[in-house]
Swiss-Prot record:
It catalyses: carbamoyl phosphate + L-aspartate = N-carbamoyl-L-aspartate + phosphate + H(+). One of its GO terms (molecular function) is amino acid binding. Keywords: Pyrimidine biosynthesis, Transferase. This is Aspartate carbamoyltransferase catalytic subunit. The keyword tRNA processing does not apply.
Amino acid sequence: MRNSLYKKNIISINDLQRNELELVLNKSAMLKKTPQPNLLKNKVIASCFFEASTRTRLSFETAIYRLGASIVGFSDGNNISLEKKGETLTDTISVISSYVDAIIIRHPQEGSARLAAEFSNKKPIFNAGDGANQHPTQTLLDLFTIQETQNRLTQLNIAIVGDLKYGRTVHSLTQALAKFKHNKFYFISPDALKMPNYINNMLDKKEIYWKRHNNIEEIISEIDILYMTRIQKERLDSTEYANAKSKFVLRAAILKNARNNMKILHPLPRIDEIDRDVDYTPYAWYFKQAANGIYARQAILSLVLIEKHL
């Protein structure tokens, strides 16, 4: 099979075709079943986190080590030349690219990953999150988890709850699932944090069903995937936040009418939008979802850095 991902920048989930997504998911499953500890031996990968991260950074680093590659970089953007000495992002990337085979970047500025790709001397860039814009590798692990639990990525009813305006994970996930046939979307959020129009317009253009709902109870019996996200306190005034906090919290009692196959996902961190008692239900899948990040990131790293795969 031709590997069209070889040397490709992974900036946005929209840059990947459906067949490329399927290639990554198949490779993820293979690596989960059969580890390949020397697949990226002698490769050096830079991990450049200009913004704080725990799960994404550690997941990437674990994936790199388990493939036999080496890693260099930083996890605190405040202590590098760009901040201390006023060096530009583009100069930083240009220099780092001369040391390594690929660069992973997280940056608070939207569009920063695509800008970095213009100055990386053709070394592949992996976007680990650029502001409220995109988070493609999170989407890959989300798709992998959905496929594992539902045995398909088509004909799914997906509810997405929480901060749909600023949540980069929900934008990427909706765009990715829109590439697969006959999926339906249910959006549940405060009015101030509803899904951006460009996402809704994209679904309309593709004639994909979507609808806004006021609470989780309305749709719990209809859905296959419940994708929860946290509502950030700083996004709302105190009254709106208090209302949202009570209205958009998932409690175990709400799950009594859920389908047997339904699974709850969350990009984490979870604050108080999922009660702890939900953790003990068969629907809770967010910690297994996080663990799948290693395999999805191993898959995309190896496909981009190695042309031929068995």
